[in-house]
Curated annotation (Swiss-Prot):
It holds the Pfam family TrmE_N. This is tRNA modification GTPase MnmE. Homodimer. Heterotetramer of two MnmE and two MnmG subunits. GTP binds at residues 226-231, 245-251, 270-273, 335-338, 358-360. The lineage of its organism: Bacteria, Pseudomonadati, Pseudomonadota, Gammaproteobacteria, Enterobacterales. Its cofactor is K(+).
């Protein structure tokens, strides 16, 4: 398998459809056109032609589009064949194309990978293609499109350029120490560094919003049996996703629902009631509940308000709180306010949010929705944002750490060499986002998650 091979793949989803598209990219795309179509179509014009088998019989007829490189998505010669979307027809056409020597099925994401390697896209834009396809809300789709059009890359490139200028200034001060002006202590470098740090902080804030849009928040509902966990899942989901009865232990396994709160994806997980298991099935369900809790972004500690007046989670169930992972945020949800007569709403107890509601009637559930959105710092008024992945957040975080360390070196010891090194490392972290500085292993992991035809 070589990167110089000509590749082919179906660009439309598998299964029956009105239209099915095969995409070919590489040096032999021209030969495919001449062999299957009998001619080379006019560049960038839709040509309605028969698609022929090796014996000259017609396999299908449809639209052929020819994009000679480098003016194509991949930067190579690209041919698209748009025929009928029946799986048998597409399979016959694909087999016909693969009889031509030098062609092979594309790896997942290989078309986008070639576009990146041929400088048609940077890495953040290439990732945005997959994010646009996988977008689960209108806001996520718009943000992914902004990233694809270069909004995120432009912000990162601006930071890289600012760091380049700052490095030049710092290294000039190091190389010419005998100048009358002490460049390191005259305040200009500190001012420029502060500007870069402020710009980076703004990008990090937007990236966190973009990450929430892409990945969402994982919330686990946990508590004793019959506390109303499944009723809360149904209230948040807006449908009967879980079976609700008065019988303790009705929920035996993990139930998952995917919803949106003003555009923010929320992964809600209902778990088995936590207690001493009465049988093997319940024991497995409780083990799975704890596994989900350990991976959660937040736990909703569900409490039956008719069984206790306590509001401090440690007082309600100290063993449960002690077993939770350190620093895992907890929201105490006192349920059945319709029975207890408690005042609906949110307050705080020993650093934990406390919400009183009725999962059965839905009263107070909107307060919980707003709390979940605000607890993640999600801004529904964000305009023109971009999507971001975990690796982007990590790169931005590492760059920020290097800039803060560089600032400490500047102000503490006027150590120009150490400042220059921290600036270089920060610049390297930022360049990883757009792919200017990256490893082949990282590229392989990124593009392998794409669709075959992308």
């Amino acid at each position: 398998m070589s990167d110089n091979d000509t590749i082919v793949a179906q660009a439309t989803p598998p299964g029956r459809g009105g239209v099915g598209i095969l995409r070919i990219s590489g040096l032999k795309a021209r030969e495919v056109a001449e062999t299957v179509l009998g001619k080379l179509p006019k560049p960038r014009y839709a040509d309605y032609l028969p698609f022929k088998d090796a014996d000259g019989s017609v396999l299908d007829q449809g639209i052929a589009l020819w994009f000679p490189g480098p003016n194509s998505f991949t930067g190579e010669d690209v041919l698209e064949l748009q025929g009928h979307g029946g799986p048998v027809i597409l399979d016959l056409l694909l087999k016909r194309i693969l009889t031509i020597p030098g062609l092979r099925i594309a790896r997942p994401g290989e078309f986008s990978e070639r576009a990146f390697l041929n400088d048609k896209l940077d890495l953040a834009q290439a990732e945005a293609i997959a994010d646009l396809i996988d977008a689960s809300s209108e806001q996520a789709a718009r943000s992914a499109l902004n990233s694809l059009q270069g909004a995120f890359s432009a912000r990162v490139n601006h930071l890289v350029e600012a760091l380049t200028h700052l490095r030049i200034y710092v290294e000039a001060a190091i190389d010419f120490p005998d100048e009358e002006i002490d460049f390191l202590s005259d305040g200009k470098i500190e001012a420029q560094l502060n500007d870069v740090i402020a710009d980076l902080d703004a990008v990090r804030a937007e990236a966190r919003q973009g990450s929430l849009l892409r990945e969402g928040m994982k919330v686990v509902i946990a508590g004793r049996p019959n506390a109303g966990k499944s009723s809360l899942l149904n209230a948040l989901a807006g449908r009967e996703a879980a079976i609700v009865t008065d019988i303790a232990g009705t929920t035996r396994d993990v139930l998952r629902e995917h919803i949106h709160i003003d555009g923010m994806p929320l992964h809600i997980i209902d778990t088995a009631g936590l207690r001493e298991a009465s049988d093997e099935v319940e024991r497995i369900g409780i083990e799975r509940a704890w596994q989900e809790i350990e991976q959660a972004d937040r736990v909703l500690f569900m409490v039956d308000g008719t069984t206790t007046d306590a509001v401090d989670p440690a007082e309600i169930w100290s063993e449960f709180i002690a077993r939770l992972p350190a620093k895992l945020p907890i929201t105490v949800v006192r349920n059945k306010a319709d029975i207890t007569g408690e005042t609906l709403g949110m307050s705080e107890v020993n650093g934990h949010a406390l919400i009183r509601l009725s999962a059965r009637t839905g009263e107070g559930v909107d307060v919980l929705r707003n709390h979940l959105k605000q607890s993640m710092g999600f801004d529904t008024n964000m305009e023109g944002g971009f999507l971001a992945r975990r690796r982007h957040l990590q790169a931005l975080e590492q760059a920020a750490e290097h800039l803060q360390q560089g600032k400490a070196q500047l102000l503490g010891a006027w150590a120009g060499e150490l400042l220059a090194e921290e600036l270089r490392l920060a610049q390297q972290n930022l360049s990883e986002i757009t792919g200017e500085f990256t490893s082949d292993d990282l590229l392989g992991r990124i593009f392998s998650s794409f669709c075959i035809g992308k």
